[in-house]
Amino acid sequence: MTVSGSHVVAKGPKGELIKDLPAGLTITIVDGVAKVVPTEGAGTESVNWGLGRSLLSNMITGVSEGFKTVMEFSGVGYKAQAKGPDLEMNLGFTNPVMIKALPGVTFQIEKSVVTVMGMDKESVGHVAAQMRAARPPEPYKGSGVKYQDEIIRKKAGKKAAGATGAA
């Protein structure tokens, strides 16, 4: 890892990430441990201290292990297939929905489960959010695109609510 001012370059087995951390932070590397502290006399710039630490931590984790988000498709005919580096999803619309893969993001497709993988946590999360936004889970049956660990609160519906007929 190299640091020059607020510009950080992290290299690892998965690749290289370059990021500019918020101003007003000083990054030091001592004995292989990176520390982020607010610059002396920075005033209100110390509000970005936690953000800078998290960004640096995510860069290190990304270049060493990577990030992944698992998405599940539930619904009749809902599926996904790869079209080059991009993802084509059939979600019950007239035309398929295309999701562009950001640089460094890859897809692994198994039946109704798509795993979004990459070095940059922000890019992986952005692509996963785009997938979910294309057809969010609906509250009655739960069909749609959801995160694997997401719990969908289902509504009762007319029959379960005890609707009485007009008599």
Predicted regions and their residues:
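Ribosome-associated RNA-binding proteins
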Residues: M1-A167
